[in-house]
C-alpha cells in the first residue's frame, strides 16, 4: 500500500510509530522536530547538551531504539531559527518498542537532567495522569511508573478484544 500521511507532520511509518510517545513531549519546553524533515524522530531544545542526553538515553538500553546526538534548526513551531541540541531516535525494532513508555522514559531523563527548563507539569497536558507526574517529580523510576499501569492495560486488552476486526 502507498503511504498516505495521516497528518502533515507525519510523513513516514517511523514517525507514525514514534508519535504516541514523542508526541507526549510536545507541550513541554521542547521541540519535537516540527519544522524539520524528521518530526517525531528528533527532539531537542537550546538548553540541552545533546552529547550528554544521547549518552544518558542510550544508557537506558531501551528496547527497539538508540539515540544519536544532533543539532537542528526548526523552520516552524518551537524555537524557530534557533539551534536546538537533542537526539535523533533510531528505531531499530518497531515490534518491540513500547513507545508510550519510551515517552515516559525520555521525560524522566529530561526532567532529571534539565528541570525546570523541561517543564514537567506541561507533560501532563497530553499524558493526563497527574499521579505519574508527581512520581516523575519525586524522581521515581520510569520503569516503576509504567509498571504501575500494567494491570489497567491488561484489563483494557480484555475489554477491547471482542471489538477487534483484524488479528
Can you describe what each PLM-predicted range is?
Residues 44-148:
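Conserved functional hotspot residues or short segments at active or partner-binding sites
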